[in-house]
Amino acid sequence: MIIPAIDLIEGQVVRLYQGDYAQQTTFDLSPLAQLQAYQAQGATWLHIVDLTGAKDPDRRQTRLIGELVENLEANIQVGGGIRSEAQVKELLDLGVKRVVIGSLAVKQPELVQSWLETYGSDAICLALDVNINQAGEKIVAVSGWQSGGGKTLESLVATFAPYGLKHALVTDISRDGTLQGSNTQLYQEIVARYPDIEWQASGGIATLDDVSAVRNSGASGIIIGKALLINNFTVQEAIACWPNA
C-alpha cells in the first residue's frame, strides 16, 4: 500500500534531513490541498506527522489535524508527540483512524500495551525509528531522534506482540529524507521474522524502483514524503508499481 506523508511544523509542510530540526526544508504548500491531491490520485491512507508536537507536546497541532481529517475521505494515521491516553482518545475522536506511537513505546511500554488492549490493534501503530550499529543491531531511537533509546527492535516487538501488535512503521534513520533508497534488507528481515505484523517502510524513497524494491521486500505499506513533494513521481505512478494498494 502506498501511504503519502506530510510533516507539519507550525502549520507548514516541511521535511527534515535525518530527523534534524536544523536541517529543515519548508514547502510553500497548503497541507489540505496537498493531501487532497494525494487522495485524488488514489491514496486510501495518508500519514501526518506533527513535528511541532514531537518536539514540544504542549504545542501539538491538534486543531489543524482535526480540520484536515474533516476535509478528507482517506484514512488518516497521525504521529508526533503523543504522550498520554487523553491525546490518543482526542485524535481518535477527531476521526483519525490510527495513532502512531514512538518514544513512549520505549519509555512507558505498559501504558502503550494498555492502549492496544483498549483501542484495538488497528488503532495503534508503533513507530520504530532505528539506528543500525556496527554489530547490525537495530537500536530504537526516542524523542524525535534527539536521543538513543537503547532497546532493540526485536525486544520491543516481544514486548508488544502479546498485546496484539499488528501495525509497525520502521524507519532506518540513516536513510530518512536522504533520497538514497530504502533499506530493503531491513524490511525483508523483519517481515520474515514477524509475518503477522503489517510493516510500514519509511525513509529514503526516491524513485519508483525504490517503491518496487520495498514491495518486493514483503512490507505491507510504504510511507513516501519528500519524493512526492519534490515531484520525483506521483502517487498514481507509485500505486501502479504496487498493485492491490
Swiss-Prot record:
Q: Where in the cell is it found?
A: Cytoplasm
Q: HAMAP family, from UniProt?
A: HisA
Which protein family is named in the record? Belongs to the HisA/HisF family.
The UniProt entry lists the main location of this chain as: cytoplasm
Tell me the protein's name: 1-(5-phosphoribosyl)-5-[(5-phosphoribosylamino)methylideneamino] imidazole-4-carboxamide isomerase
The chemistry this enzyme catalyses reads: 1-(5-phospho-beta-D-ribosyl)-5-[(5-phospho-beta-D-ribosylamino)methylideneamino]imidazole-4-carboxamide = 5-[(5-phospho-1-deoxy-D-ribulos-1-ylimino)methylamino]-1-(5-phospho-beta-D-ribosyl)imidazole-4-carboxamide
The organism's superkingdom is given as Bacteria
The molecular function GO annotations come to: 1-(5-phosphoribosyl)-5-[(5-phosphoribosylamino)methylideneamino]imidazole-4-carboxamide isomerase activity
Coiled-coil ranges from the UniProt annotation: none
Instruction: Name a biological process GO annotation.
Output: L-tryptophan biosynthetic process
EC number of the protein: 5.3.1.16
The record's Pfam families line, in alphabetical order, gives: His_biosynth
What pathway does this protein act in?
Answer: Amino-acid biosynthesis; L-histidine biosynthesis; L-histidine from 5-phospho-alpha-D-ribose 1-diphosphate: step 4/9
The keyword Cytoplasm belongs to this UniProt entry's keyword annotation: yes
